[in-house]
Amino acid sequence: LLAQTASPSLQPLFADIALQSERDKLRQHLRDRTLGETLALPLNPENEYRYQSACWAISQFMPADPRIETLLRRCLQHYRLLETETRRAFLEALYTVHPAGFESGLLALLEAEAHPKLFAMICLYLQRSDPANRSALLARMRSRWPQADAHPILSSLQSFLHAADQKEKAPPPDVGDIFRYQHSFGIKTVYSFQRWDRDQPGLAAVQGSDGRFVRDSAGRLLLFRQLARSGSNLPYFITNGNTPQGIFSIQGIGQSTNRFIGPTPNLQLTMPFEDGWKGYFQMPADTSEPKASYAYLLPEGWRAYAPAWEAYAAGQAGRTEIIAHGTTIDPSFFWGQPFHPISPTLGCLCAPEDWDPQTGLLRDSEQLRLTEAFRKAPGPSKGYFIVLNLDDSRRPIERADLETLIEAYERGQ
């Protein structure tokens, strides 16, 4: 997901991976080599890297193939002999495509798993399959790690399990307060409004440094479709999990070298704690007191709202390289999913794009419109990017949801 900061090309955008011939090759490679050839080999130290790669591919592309269960059960059988990264890839793939059926095997591994992140991933699988497991899982965690409160991942796991049946019901504080607060700083801001159910796509809006939201020449609010769901759908504090809520820092506009992200200009974001807080704050701040400095970015009425701190907790847990980008991935991988045709990611925010499969040229792009709106909005080339869940409705965020919020704010200006 590393991206190179650069000015976008003025030439038509082209992605060879979007050609139908390349998409067909990728599908064949996943079918014949990633799964077929890997399963023909024993899972031993010599071939372990192939199983790890297969698990990563399962998490990203979510292919429908009955052989996947065979591969995952083989990984479970050999789990104690696997390297840490292969264990993580297996648990991520399992969480992605098999929400049930592996409970007894994972429960047997839980007591011996000494890696906090892997322990957390096992707990999350068991809690999702049966929410009644929550109390027992918390008790095991506290018994194993009495100082869990001091560990970034385990403390987030504890909060997540405690709030699993409550957070969706709690509405956020007044969103207008966020709009007014950002205006008071005179800092350009992108807001990505999401649902708690990240299967549902959200919408992004751009507020200039003058406090006004970007509109078209007819005065219509500009909104941009965006998915904040990772392939795994793991929580925000796990690597490759869903995009955390909270405040990211926009460092500018760049272009990626990743073929699946594609060449469309993206918004370069940094998180709390990423790269030693370098460049995160858009104003003078004391990074020796990061909690107080982050809190200052929130209106007073939002500082006790736990979801607004997800980005802080995720950064503290080691998450990095979350950006807002487009996609060249064949949307047919996700046919039938609520978020089709947008691609889930490794935790970034993804806008839909349409590439001509015959020429590889970009035909339509929400991502391009978003970056252009940010570029043209009043203010410098940097700013903040704020991700907020509005509620737990099982439907995408729609224009009417945001027009009500934004117009109420603008009437009060």
Regions found by a protein language model. Give the residues of each.
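Bacterial Sec-dependent N-terminal signal peptides
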Residues: 1-5
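Cell wall/extracellular polymer interaction/catalysis modules
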Residues: 6-62, 67-72, 80-88, 92-99, ...
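A short acidic, amphipathic alpha-helical/loop segment
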Residues: 105-109
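Active-site nucleophilic cysteine motif
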Residues: 320, 340-353
